[in-house]
């Protein structure tokens, strides 16, 4: 069996779509979830993200709204895109990048259409993951932040 590293960011609806089929890879090996800070990659390569380019953002949104129902995936655009990513990244990190934590973040953003930086939504996600102290969950992500700017970490 192979070890499979899946690198993703919560900002991308395409990562959300891939995540919906990720369990299929588990038949071929152990899947390690590796969240990345997309902004760090863009900064490193001196490039704009697709959501920062109006035509690309419109195309991506239209395509995602078409793709999801074609593939039986529940999908709802969040109110603003791009959006701040640190809260979902820190929550995933605090929960050991578990499948449940990654699913909770993806579902909140792309299935429920939630705003990732909303504190009440963050507290609710912490509660559903059994994390009693949301402030500690945010602080636990400091280690993630320290390595997030390093491409290829």
Indicate where each model-derived feature is located.
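C-terminal cap of thioredoxin/glutaredoxin-like
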Residues: 3-4, 11, 15-32, 97-100, ...
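Generic hydrophobic-segment detector
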Residues: 2-5, 62
């Amino acid at each position: 069996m192979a070890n499979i590293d899946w690198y993703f960011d919560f900002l991308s609806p395409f990562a959300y779509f891939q995540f919906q089929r990720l369990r299929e890879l588990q038949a071929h090996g152990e899947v390690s979830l590796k969240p990345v800070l997309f902004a760090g990659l863009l900064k490193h390569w001196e490039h704009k993200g697709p959501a920062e380019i109006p035509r690309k953002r419109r195309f991506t949104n239209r395509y995602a709204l078409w793709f999801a129902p074609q593939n039986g995936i529940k999908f709802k655009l969040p109110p603003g895109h791009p959006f701040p990513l640190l809260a979902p990244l820190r929550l995933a990190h605090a929960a050991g990048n578990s499948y449940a934590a990654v699913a909770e973040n993806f579902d909140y953003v792309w299935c429920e259409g939630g705003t990732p930086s909303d504190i009440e939504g963050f507290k609710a996600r912490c509660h559903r993951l059994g994390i009693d102290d949301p402030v500690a969950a945010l602080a636990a992500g400091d280690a993630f932040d320290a390595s997030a700017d390093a491409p290829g970490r």
